[in-house]
């Protein structure tokens, strides 16, 4: 498959991307929250449980991995990328080195990881990865994000995307405007518009083939501490409006990040977006916590009961798969408990 075919497959209707690329530090926090020791064995066991689930075939188009996981071997002797491929999904890799303080800014962040990326991409391709991910983060305050932050991160995302395509892989472009703060939904709309528009300007300058990319943006949401809450209908309307205004038509689709949304909110909001989608874009998900949280809690209580954990994960994956086609509803959600 060439990169355009892979990108289309990644955003296919009925499926979405499992973000299992948490760094060791992030996994430590997640496992600690459920009273499980964070060691290589436990990290692998939990992830392997998800990657072997039945829903991988019909609901998961791709899996984003952390460097450690890409190099691991499953209990059946297959490498993790081989296990994912056997499950009917595409293996991918997170390639950024995290967000650091942007010099000359008011504590804003710039993502690092461009040094040596060309060589790393060659190795990741040999290890079986066929797409990559790079995340840029922007926080909203009275002054931020600054022009410096927006431009610096867009430039880094574009350089990354060009290097990934050079290695015959699909870049996921992830500009995340964080939910933290008391900003309104309109403020989120304005900032996200500026951020996405700048990203596509830089991608054009760097001659990136947009048909071989996937956008992973935030939904348009009010800040976590905003007093004015928004309905799923309003979130969907503003999100669609923002993307129609700023996304070039060549991009095959969008895989939304879940940000700080709960599992149900992330599913419901995606469903609403697809209900009113009047574009040629496919709107799907690239969720981490919003796909894994319930499964993680179940696994922590009964690590040996793999089928039980997989059942919980399969339900979440099916619900999100349904929401990519606007087929999710409360009754379907409750069917799992029945």
Roles of regions detected by a PLM:
Residues 90, 170, 212-214, 253:
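Proline-centered loop/turn at the N-terminus of a beta-strand
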Residues 117-203:
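Helix-rich catalytic cores of soluble enzyme domains
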């Amino acid at each position: 498959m060439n990169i355009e075919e892979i990108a289309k497959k990644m955003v296919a209707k009925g499926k979405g991307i499992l973000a299992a690329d948490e760094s060791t530090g992030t996994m430590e926090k997640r496992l600690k929250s459920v009273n499980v020791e964070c060691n290589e064995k436990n990290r692998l066991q939990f992830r392997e449980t998800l990657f072997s689930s039945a829903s991988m075939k019909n609901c998961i188009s791709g899996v984003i991995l952390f460097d450690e996981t890409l190099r691991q071997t499953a209990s059946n002797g297959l490498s993790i990328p081989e296990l994912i491929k056997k499950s009917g999904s595409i293996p991918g890799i997170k390639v950024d080195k995290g967000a650091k303080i942007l010099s000359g800014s008011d504590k804003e962040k710039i993502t690092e990881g461009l040094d040596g990326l060309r060589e790393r991409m060659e190795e990741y391709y040999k290890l079986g990865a066929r797409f990559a991910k790079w995340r840029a983060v922007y926080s909203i305050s009275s002054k931020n994000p600054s022009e410096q932050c927006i431009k610096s991160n867009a430039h880094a995302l574009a350089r990354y995307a060009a290097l990934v395509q050079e290695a015959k892989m699909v870049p996921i472009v992830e500009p995340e405007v964080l939910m933290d703060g008391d900003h309104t939904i309109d403020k989120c709309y304005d900032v996200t518009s500026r951020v996405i528009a700048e990203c596509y300007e830089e991608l054009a300058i760097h001659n990136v083939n947009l048909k071989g990319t996937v956008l992973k943006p935030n939904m348009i949401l009010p800040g976590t501490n905003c007093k004015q809450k928004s309905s799923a209908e309003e979130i969907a309307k503003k999100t669609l409006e923002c993307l129609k205004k700023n996304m070039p038509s060549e991009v095959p689709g969008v895989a939304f990040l879940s940000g700080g949304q709960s599992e149900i909110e992330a599913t419901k909001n995606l469903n609403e977006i697809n209900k009113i989608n009047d574009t040629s874009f496919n709107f799907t998900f690239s969720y981490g916590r919003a796909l894994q949280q319930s499964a993680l809690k179940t696994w922590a209580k009964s690590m040996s009961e793999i089928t039980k954990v997989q059942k919980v994960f399969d339900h979440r994956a099916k619900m999100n798969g349904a929401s990519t086609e606007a087929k999710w509803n409360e009754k379907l959600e409750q069917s799992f408990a029945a």
